[in-house]
């Protein structure tokens, strides 16, 4: 009897981009995910975006930070862990707006010179500068009302 063939996928950037795009919620039109010079992958404009344009509204379920962390630690989704139940926005230092599925929003990298911002009532992403075609969308993570515990986490020191 011949040995069973085992499929092995070879990691390439192209394969990873394909995986990401197959598993992402496309909530920000006219953008695409690609390699970022800032960090890993980023979100880029397919065409120019004018300052003041609303890119998307963000939805989700409200929950306190502690409950979110407890749920996050107890849910094991294997290879899908990075695509489901990991995206949130801080509404205040104790409350999060959590999305069950990963969206394009999560690929907006941090910068102290952002070209998009989170606006509230309703919670949305808005361009604060003109953004050129193929420019990366960037946001200042520190502008969210983050908890002190989150801000002092050594892994989050890039936000300071």
What are these regions (language model features)?
Residues 1-160:
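Conserved catalytic SET/PR domain of SAM-dependent protein methyltransferases, capturing the structural core
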């Amino acid at each position: 009897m011949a040995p069973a063939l085992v499929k092995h996928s070879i990691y390439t950037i192209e394969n990873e981009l394909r995986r990401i795009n197959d598993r992402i919620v496309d909530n920000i039109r006219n953008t695409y995910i690609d390699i970022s010079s800032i960090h890993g992958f980023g979100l880029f404009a397919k065409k120019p975006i004018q300052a003041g344009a609303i890119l998307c509204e963000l939805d989700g379920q409200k929950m306190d930070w502690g409950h979110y962390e407890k749920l996050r630690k107890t849910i094991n989704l294997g290879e899908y862990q990075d695509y489901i139940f990991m995206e949130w926005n801080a509404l205040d230092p104790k409350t999060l707006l959590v999305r069950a599925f990963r969206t394009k929003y999560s690929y907006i990298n941090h910068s102290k010179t952002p070209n998009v911002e989170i606006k509230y009532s309703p919670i949305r992403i808005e361009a604060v500068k003109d953004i050129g075609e193929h420019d990366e969308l960037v946001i200042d993570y520190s502008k969210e009302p983050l908890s002190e515990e989150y801000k002092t986490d050594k892994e989050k020191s890039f936000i300071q």
